[in-house]
């Protein structure tokens, strides 16, 4: 448990204001008293530099990060890595609030009034509604989105996102250019997931296909441990196997690739597979996918957050990062 300024004051037998002055205005404190405070701080492993900055600025030096789903997923972990690289160097901590269910989401916003000790709130891939935005705004700190829904319309202070419409259209055009018309799209259950980005991704893919006279079959999976096995069961239960499969994310495409090959299918000869993310294993497996760069997006979001905290105006508060199609070896021209 971290020691507080109150703990230091109690151990040094001085007031909290004396501890504060020892850090921020040492010229107003006698050497004897200041030495007592510093000795107590050392014994309690109290962070002098951090506390001094907090006391001087009146800030918490803490950023709240709202994450939908599991934080060990590639996108979430990469985003947190990018945020931490910037915030850590500036003396800020990150408090992560993970919301994997509607209940956890409701609990967070119900408890929001007691969570005012943050300097900004960052919302990652979260399909947040107008009422929740108003609740966040009541804390009176900047709200920054990363791949979040309608950030400009819903009152975010700033936001970064990948162009999911462009990315999905690139994936759809790629498969159709290879001659595929019998396409399946695998996605997570929207009633379960709180991700916004994947919903826009799905809608754009379907729209591009339908514009070209193709109606993909949609398979829905959950986020359980055996979800890919269930998807393979769904695929094998179809009247016939699709010639191409587009996956909502690499986290579905990578295990699907292995499961299909275990069931006797050769990728891409029997079926083409395309993912979305260009995650850590995509290159080694030769997965055709759509690249996004969550670390870079998060770093930019963190820099904008710091500017907003300091009251500096942003030249471009809402930024869109382009998607990129990465063609590897899991997609090929239609063979049948």
Identify the meaning behind each predicted range.
Residues 1-61, 335:
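N-terminal helix-turn-helix DNA-binding module of bacterial transcription factors
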Residues 229-336:
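Flexible loop/turn connectors
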Residues 181-182, 216-217, 267-273:
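Short acidic capping loops at alpha-helix termini that bridge into adjacent secondary structure
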Residues 16-18, 55-71, 182-191:
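Short beta-strand segments enriched in small/hydrophobic residues
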Residues 68-77, 96-105, 160-170, 186-231, ...:
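Hinge/beta->alpha junction and helix N-cap segments in small-molecule ligand-binding domains
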Residues 66, 124, 146, 185-186, ...:
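Short hydrophobic segments within beta-strands
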Residues 3-4, 58-173, 236-240:
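Alpha-helical recognition/docking segments in bacterial nutrient-uptake
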């Amino acid at each position: 448990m971290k020691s507080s300024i109150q703990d230091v004051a109690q151990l040094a037998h001085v007031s909290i204001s004396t501890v504060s002055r020892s850090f921020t205005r040492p010229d107003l404190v006698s050497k004897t008293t200041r030495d007592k405070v510093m000795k107590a701080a050392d014994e309690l492993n109290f962070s002098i530099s951090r506390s001094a900055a907090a006391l001087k600025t009146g800030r918490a030096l803490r950023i709240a990060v709202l994450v939908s789903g599991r934080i060990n997923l590639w996108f979430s972990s990469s985003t947190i890595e990018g945020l931490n690289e910037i915030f850590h160097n500036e003396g800020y901590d990150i408090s992560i609030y993970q919301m994997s269910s509607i209940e956890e989401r409701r609990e967070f916003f119900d408890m929001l009034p007691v969570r005012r000790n943050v300097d900004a709130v960052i919302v990652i891939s979260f399909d947040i509604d107008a009422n929740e935005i108003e609740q966040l705004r009541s804390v009176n700190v900047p709200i920054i989105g990363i791949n979040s829904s309608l950030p400009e319309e819903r009152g975010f202070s700033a936001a970064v996102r990948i162009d999911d419409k462009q990315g999905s259209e690139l994936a759809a055009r790629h498969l159709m250019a290879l001659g595929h018309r019998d396409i399946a799209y695998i996605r997570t259950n929207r009633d379960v997931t709180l991700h916004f980005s994947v919903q826009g991704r799905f809608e754009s893919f379907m729209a591009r296909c339908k514009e070209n006279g193709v109606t993909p079959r949609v398979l829905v999976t959950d986020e359980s441990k055996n979800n890919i096995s269930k998807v393979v069961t769904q695929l094998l239960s179809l009247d016939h196997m699709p010639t191409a499969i587009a996956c909502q994310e690499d986290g579905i495409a990578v295990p699907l690739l292995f499961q299909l090959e275990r069931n006797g299918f050769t990728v891409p000869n029997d079926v083409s597979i395309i993912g979305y993310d260009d995650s850590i294993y995509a290159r080694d497996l030769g997965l055709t996918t759509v690249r996004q760069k969550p670390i870079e997006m998060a770093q930019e979001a963190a820099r904008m957050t710091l500017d907003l905290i300091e009251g500096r105006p942003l030249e471009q508060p809402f930024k869109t990062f382009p998607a990129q199609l990465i063609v590897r070896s899991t997609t090929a021209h239609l063979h049948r």
